[in-house]
């Protein structure tokens, strides 16, 4: 995998965002890679790679109506 961590972001059609931090191993197991995108009936899914958890938290601080799910 290209990055150490990945951020799974579900942009719900109601206007909220649910985000989950994944290790590279977990992202790979889910079939994700950097810039992965998919549309479903309930949300748009985006996956972006990051080198650190701190970088993910910095990115998340700019998102509106975002909930970090563990």
Regions picked out by a protein language model, each given a short descriptive name:
Residues 2-44:
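Short aromatic-glycine-(Arg/Gly/Cys) micro-motifs in beta-strand/loop hairpins
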Residues 47-70:
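Low-complexity intrinsically disordered segments
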């Amino acid at each position: 995998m290209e990055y150490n961590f990945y951020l799974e972001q579900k942009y719900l059609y109601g206007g909220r965002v649910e985000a989950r931090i994944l290790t590279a191993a977990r992202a790979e197991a889910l079939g994700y890679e950097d810039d992965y995108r998919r549309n479903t009936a309930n949300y748009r899914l985006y996956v972006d790679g990051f080198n650190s958890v701190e970088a993910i938290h910095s990115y998340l601080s700019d998102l509106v109506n975002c909930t970090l799910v563990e």
